[in-house]
A protein has these predicted regions:
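A short beta-strand motif characteristic of beta-propeller blades
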Residues: 145-150, 190
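Hydrophobic beta-strand positions that form the internal "hydrophobic ladder"
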Residues: 165-169
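Acidic/His/Gly-enriched intrinsically disordered linker/tail segments
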Residues: 1-91, 95-143, 147
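A flexible loop/linker signature enriched in serine peptidases of the S9 family
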Residues: 35, 84, 151-156, 171-184
Length: 190
């Protein structure tokens, strides 16, 4: 008798695919929808050439808006796969990943749709960039220089004027590590 041990990864489904398929679900599902907040984050990354790479989408552990971007990128990429190749391909990718000898999402994607995950990512990236360039063309021709009142934090939200109009109260994750950790800030307009 010979005893042998082989290191086999227990989880091969990357976060973008797990979260993206959970949010997409299936055709005509109406539980979780693409919304303006998700779109704003992804649009900003796309037009500023700062999209998460295919490899970066495969992990959490980022600070600020980075983890949120893994969710948003995964949801959008799963929608892209469903719209471009058919929603059945998402299921096929997951089935491919369930094989005991399949350790690569890149290969599982190639087996399902005929191109590697990296090639798919480049198609997705081009589609995003082209789409957002078209949508922002008129905006870009009328850009104004804003007066930035605070440049800390990745989430500065829910601004509210004081009754006398001299202060702005808002919540921000400035001085915190995560998107969900916010404090109340008061900005004095004076």
């Amino acid at each position: 008798n010979i005893l042998a041990s082989y290191a086999i990864p227990g989880t091969v489904i990357p976060p973008w695919l797990a979260e993206g398929t959970a949010q997409f679900m299936y055709d005509n599902a109406d539980w979780d929808n693409w919304d303006t907040h998700r779109d704003m984050i992804l649009r900003d990354r796309a037009i500023n050439n700062n999209l998460l790479s295919f490899t970066e989408m495969n992990t959490f552990g980022k600070s600020g808006i980075g983890n949120e971007s893994t969710y948003n990128s995964g949801y959008k990429l799963c929608r892209f796969i469903a719209l471009s190749y058919g929603s059945d391909k998402l299921k096929e990718i997951l089935i491919n990943l369930s094989s005991p000898l399949q350790f690569s999402v890149n290969n599982a994607i190639k087996k399902a749709i005929g191109i590697t995950g990296y090639e798919l990512y480049e198609e997705y990236k081009k589609s995003l960039s082209d789409g957002y360039q078209l949508l922002t063309k008129n905006i870009k021709s009328n850009i104004s220089s804003p007066n930035i009142i605070i440049d800390k934090g990745t989430a500065n939200m829910h601004p509210t004027w004081s009754p006398d109009g001299t202060n702005i109260a808002f919540i921000s994750n400035a001085d915190n590590d995560f998107f969900s950790q916010t404090d109340l800030f008061i900005y004095d307009k004076k």
